[in-house]
């Protein structure tokens, strides 16, 4: 249960930060988002693996770093946190109106590609810095994960919204930042990016497969001192 609670808390603070920063149109929104993700990853990595993102949970599942039952529980906790964080962000900012991103025509394909690429990048970084047996007890995993999200937000935020996370997309839709008709783009991108990252990790690390690791890695962390399978 504490793993799921840790996922809920971390996802909540990630989504509430995204919501408030975007509604208030802060120029430093990518920095705030990357920063809160970094500290929350460090805070919960030893408990849950600090995914805070269904796409990362999918990547960890494909990679074999988490069980299907735990993965399902993580996704439920992340989705619930996303919705409640959106409600909290709306109450705090009390926006009279928000600019809703609606994708149509060519923008759908462009956004799908952008989101898939950076979701893949995020999940790929997470698996390599936080679950690889070649990086036991490292201290840089949080910075690498937060930095990836920050870079992606700056690069494609103006194109697709820079989501890379279905929990963020769900919260954004509740808050009115994303049109409900466009949510499927972020869900499909998560499926593509997360599954591709997990498959590529296994292809590039044939000696680091689930059946070759200790039982401790089934929590989505390295075998010695837990680090997150993470965003």
Name every feature range the model reports, one short phrase each.
Residues 1-231:
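Membrane-interface helix-loop junctions and terminal tails of multi-pass membrane proteins
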């Amino acid at each position: 249960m504490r793993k799921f609670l840790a996922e809920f808390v971390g996802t909540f603070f990630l989504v509430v930060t995204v919501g408030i920063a975007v509604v208030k149109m802060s120029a430093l929104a990518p920095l705030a988002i990357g920063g809160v993700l970094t500290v929350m990853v460090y805070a919960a990595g030893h408990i849950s693996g600090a995914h805070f993102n269904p796409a990362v949970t999918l990547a960890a599942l494909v990679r074999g770093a988490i069980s299907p039952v735990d993965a399902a529980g993580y996704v439920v906790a992340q989705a619930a946190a996303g919705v409640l964080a959106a409600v909290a962000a709306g109450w705090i900012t009390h926006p009279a109106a928000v600019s809703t991103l609606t994708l149509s025509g060519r923008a759908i394909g462009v956004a799908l590609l952008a989101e898939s690429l950076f979701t893949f990048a995020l999940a790929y970084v997470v698996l390599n810095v936080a679950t690889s047996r070649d990086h036991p007890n490292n201290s840089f995993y949080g910075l690498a994960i937060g930095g990836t999200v920050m870079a992606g937000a700056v690069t494609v935020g103006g194109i697709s919204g820079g989501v890379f996370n279905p929990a963020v997309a769900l919260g954004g839709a509740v808050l009115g930042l994303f049109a409900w008709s466009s949510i499927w783009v972020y869900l499909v991108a998560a499926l593509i990016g997360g599954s591709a990252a997990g498959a590529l990790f296994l292809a590039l690390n044939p000696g680091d497969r689930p059946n070759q690791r200790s039982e401790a890695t089934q929590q989505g962390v390295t075998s010695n001192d837990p680090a997150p399978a993470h965003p």
